[in-house]
Amino acid sequence: MAEAEGSSLLLLPPPPPPPRMAEVEAPTAAETDMKQYQGSGGVAMDVERSRFPYCVVWTPIPVLTWFFPIIGHMGICTSTGVIRDFAGPYFVSEDNMAFGKPAKYWKLDPAQVYASGPNAWDTAVHDASEEYKHRMHNLCCDNCHSHVALALNLMRYNNSTNWNMVTLCFFCLLYGKYVSVGAFVKTWLPFILLLGIILTVSLVFNLR
């Protein structure tokens, strides 16, 4: 009897290994990119849906940008990424940027807003947009850049009330990031082609 019990114990299968902790999966490239685009306050940037929280956004204007690549159409986004842009006389667009989706964005820091009151960023964007609903659009003097400048002045971004179209154009050129390679090509290729044509024609006439 003892031998039978000993034999049965020897025939029992080995116990299963103890459960291990679940392995942590490495983040995918898309997840890594999304973390890089993560906005302040936990609101994520979404290029496909044109959501750029706390950003100034820019897109090329057909023909005009072909000759002057640093000149384009500008808007400013709310804390949730909704774009507001002065799109024409007495009209400020919401979530439907004139001239197409943004090609470039300039990420700002909401901690640099010095205006008092709750939700100062969105309040400034709203007040600037309401003001420009009563203004005539002027390409040279009072345009989309001026609308964005007013919003930044109202919120006292970087503790300044001296924002204007020139400073915005410069900082957007310096700190702006293209949303994709295609956006970069869309902005600069027409200018490069036109420049090439002008140089070629000039060279041909000089060689005659």
UniProtKB/Swiss-Prot annotation:
Record keywords, A-Z: Cell projection, Disease variant, Epilepsy, Intellectual disability, Membrane, Transmembrane, Transmembrane helix
UniProt entry tagged with the keyword Transmembrane: yes
Tissues in which the UniProt entry reports expression: Widely expressed. The highest expression is observed in the brain.
Record-annotated membrane-spanning stretches: 56-76, 165-185, 187-207
GO cellular component: dendrite; membrane
UniProt-annotated location(s): Membrane; Cell projection, Dendrite
Extracellular topological domain: 1-55, 186
Topology in the lipid bilayer: Multi-pass membrane protein
Membrane-side (Cytoplasmic) residue stretches: 77-164, 208
Predominant place of localization: membrane
Listed InterPro entries: TMEM222/RTE1
Region annotation (Disordered) ranges: 1-26
Keyword tRNA processing among record annotations: no
Disease as annotated in the protein's UniProt record: Neurodevelopmental disorder with motor and speech delay and behavioral abnormalities: An autosomal recessive disorder characterized by global developmental delay, impaired intellectual development, speech delay, delayed walking, and behavioral abnormalities. Some patients develop spastic tetraplegia with inability to walk independently and never gain proper speech. Affected individuals may have variable additional features, including poor overall growth, hypotonia, tremor, ocular anomalies, seizures, and non-specific dysmorphic facial features.
Descriptive protein name: Transmembrane protein 222
Species this protein is from: Homo sapiens (Human)
Gene: TMEM222
